[in-house]
Amino acid sequence: MQKVQVHKGDTYFVPAGMVHGIGKGILVAEIQESSNVTYRVYDYDRIDKNGKKREIHFDKAVQVMDMGITPDVRQKPRMVRYYSGCSRELLCRCKYFETERVQVTKGFAFSVLDSSFQILVCLSGYGEVQTMDAEQKPMRFSKGETLFLPARLGRCLVIGETELIKVRC
């Protein structure tokens, strides 16, 4: 195991099988492939909703660990688009998801297609998501909140002054 110095705004891609942990005082948005499996090697003696220590899965975890994975998992954001009122940086893309950092000062338009849902995580500021569906009320959000946008929602518009993580699955 290696300790990695992290800074606000850093992006890391941690592939399946790579043992990892999150240090004290660090807040993360952990985006992962849709799966019901998490193997805990250590859990800081946290308790579950029934007041019992959460289960440790050391033997199962060892079976899926990939010790050959390179520790350099830091991603370099790449500007996707910059225009008046909005900038978009690609943070990470893999076969399961794509994440972007979106800085909105006026508006940001995008589509949620038939194939899958999308997620918006508000890192700072505030705003609302409007859709073309007159029956759909605008969805307001502020720092720390997450919006789930279901498949087939269609054309969306984010209005406000905000920094978002946008996840497309």
Range-by-range predicted roles:
Residues 1-13, 131-153:
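Short acidic-glycine-tyrosine-enriched beta hairpin
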Residues 8, 16, 25, 93-98, ...:
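A generic structural signal for well-ordered coil/turn residues at beta-strand boundaries
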Residues 39-107, 111-114:
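C-terminal amphipathic alpha-helical segment
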Residues 25, 104-134, 143-144:
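Glycine- and acidic-residue-biased ligand/ion/polar-headgroup-sensing regions
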Residues 1-55:
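Contiguous mid-protein beta-loop-alpha structural module that forms a pocket-lining wall or clamp
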Residues 4, 11-12, 20, 110-112, ...:
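His/acidic/aromatic-lined binding-pocket segments of jelly-roll/cupin-type domains
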Residues 19, 36, 96, 107, ...:
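Short, glycine-/Ser/Thr-/acidic-enriched flexible segments
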Residues 17-37, 142, 151-169:
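Ligand-binding loop in jelly-roll beta-barrel domains
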